Amino acid sequence: MTTQTFRSDFLRTLHERGYIHQCSDLERLDAKAAEGPITAYIGFDATASSLHAGHLLSIMMLRTLQRTGHNPIALMGGGTTKIGDPSGKDEARKMLTDQQIEDNIASIRKVFARFLDFGAGAKMENNASWLDELKYIPLLREVGPHFTINRMLTFDSVKLRLEREQPLTFLEFNYMILQAYDFVELNARHGCILQMGGSDQWGNIVNGMELGRRMRGADLFALTTPLLTTSSGAKMGKTAGGAVWLDADLLSPYEYWQYWRNAGDADVERFLKLFTELPLDEIARLAALEGQEINHAKEVLATEATALLHGREAAEKAKETSRATFADGALAVDLPTVEVPRATLEAGLPVAKAFVDAGLVASTSEARRQIKGGGLKVNDVTVTDEKAVIDLGALTPEGVVKLSLGKKKHVLLKPV
């Protein structure tokens, strides 16, 4: 479908801004959304106390859904988190207590409240409210006939573990069944007809769609987004310093602003479409900037993305702090520079070793102590992961990586 043929504002907006990867029936879903408000959901694990930038694509889809007159549901996996999604994992996830999961959900709700209006159609649900109440034999009789072991073994989350001869527990094997059941339950409770998610979740989403059709005769839809990486191949939401958290207690608005300011030139237009609400003609103007002027577009990206999460005042303050710190190219000119072989960054330089090589700490053990105390930063983002590596994706627009110990000691790594 082209932009002109969409009848619904919701899908037209998603299409124009590059959110759509795959849909079970785009034309019929568009017709439904054009007729009146629809209800759609995206599921989120409760494995951490915050979401990170890798979740933003899903959050922005829910926000777009609400802004175009529909009803979003943010489904927290309070029940499924007790099992753990085996997708993309080589081993079983760490088991969390019920209290840890509840605390995580309470914290994550604050993030959603920045993007969704829970008083105007948006809802947050917790699948523990129905999964915890299921009885085993009735579940097997009601849901079991609709799943074949043959098909379940073809899913990547299962197949990859078995091919690698890594254990897959019966607990994890049940994850896809319970995840599919969520769609059935949300359709029954809220008339929900659409599940959205990343393209890696396509099989799980289609499972739920088919289960709803078989159990309830429901007319359901699946829609996925592209799996997003930066132009350097890095995973969204990850930096050399660790995860880019959406919680100001874990990552300051200034550090969040810096994450977006450090976007690669090739990513600017795409990120402006996906992670800001600027008009498309303004985005096209910014994307056309060249040379040093592209840095203005990156500042706009950083400020608009930060304003959505932390508010306009915090975003403007972060921008001014950055300008005061790096006015007139001070970053590239005035700081001591250590050269590293480009091949070293291509292979991935352990962050602790990088600080040793830069002369900022005496040993990797000291670097690890500093990381635990929040004393090290890469490109002005606090390092939280001792095992993080610095690669070419960490290069700033100036072609360097900035390492900081505390507030006053800075060194630039420059690939040669």
From Swiss-Prot:
Keywords: Aminoacyl-tRNA synthetase, ATP-binding, Cytoplasm, Ligase, Nucleotide-binding, Protein biosynthesis, RNA-binding
Major enzyme class: ligase
Domain S4 RNA-binding: 349-416
Residue numbers binding ATP: 238
SUPFAM superfamilies (UniProt xref): Alpha-L RNA-binding motif (SSF55174), Nucleotidylyl transferase (SSF52374)
UniProt-listed Enzyme Commission number(s): 6.1.1.1
InterPro entries: aa-tRNA-synth_Ic, Rossmann-like_a/b/a_fold, S4_RNA-bd_sf, SYY-like_C, Tyr-tRNA-ligase, Tyr-tRNA-ligase_bac-type, Tyr-tRNA-ligase_bac_1
Binding site for L-tyrosine: 41, 175, 179
Domain of life: Bacteria
Assembly information from the UniProt record: Homodimer.
Protein name, UniProt field: Tyrosine--tRNA ligase
Organism: Xanthobacter autotrophicus (strain ATCC BAA-1158 / Py2)
